[in-house]
Amino acid sequence: MEGLNSKVDHKDYMYDYTKWGVELCKLVGSPRFKLLYDIYHMQIMEGDVIRTIRQYKDYIAHYHTGGNPGRHEIDDTQELNYPAIVRAIVATGYKGFLGQEFIPVRDPMESLAQGFRICDV
């Protein structure tokens, strides 16, 4: 289940804080029901991304990237430090994929390659 922000993009979306999603996972009670942690959305709603990832790692099954503000490239024009975030994700033991989910304002293939380089820690 993917958490989205209700502040900018998805007004009135129910799952807009990680803790809400974690509580839902506990209620469902299945090891097959987990969270998709969208770093862009959760930065907007709650910040403290690295601490949240570490705290709730057992409930997260997948990650999405995206620059903030604007959900554009993950480069030095936005506020998230993706090398540090990805190192924290790796330190949790996560072995899955990191989805590059952003809206490029430059050449899409160049932006995607840049995203891979930034996240290759």
Enumerate the language-model features and the residues they cover.
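Short beta-strand segments at enzyme active-site cores
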Residues: 1-3, 99
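Active-site-proximal beta-strand/loop segments in catalytic clefts of secreted hydrolases
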Residues: 3-4, 66
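Conserved beta-strand edge residues that scaffold enzyme active sites
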Residues: 4-6, 103
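Surface-exposed cleft-lining segments at the edges of enzyme active sites
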Residues: 6-13
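Histidine-acidic metal/acid-base catalytic patches
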Residues: 15-121
